């Protein structure tokens, strides 16, 4: 199990990014969370199988249909063994 923090920049708010991230996490069997940040970026943490996390990161880099992702930042985090679901924060 791996956990990654992802920050997506560009036109990533008000385009369904958090909703799509939640759908992708559910489809891939990942736990974690996603939220909008005051600086206009979207921050996420996801954990699960390495291949599923990589697929999630790829989808985040592409963004949903109306997003324009200009930069993505990824860093490792310590897995949370007690986390059981994925949450959209600030919805």
Per-range role (PLM):
Residues 1-91:
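Intrinsically disordered, low-complexity, mixed-charge
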């Amino acid at each position: 199990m791996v956990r990654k923090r992802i920050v997506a920049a560009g036109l990533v708010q008000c385009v369904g990014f958090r909703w799509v991230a939640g759908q992708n996490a559910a489809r891939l069997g990942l736990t974690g969370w996603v939220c909008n940040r005051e600086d206009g970026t979207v921050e996420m943490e996801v954990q699960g199988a390495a291949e599923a996390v990589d697929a999630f990161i790829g989808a985040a880099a592409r963004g949903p249909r109306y997003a324009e992702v200009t930069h993505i930042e990824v860093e490792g985090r310590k897995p949370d063994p007690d986390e059981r679901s994925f949450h959209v924060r600030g919805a």
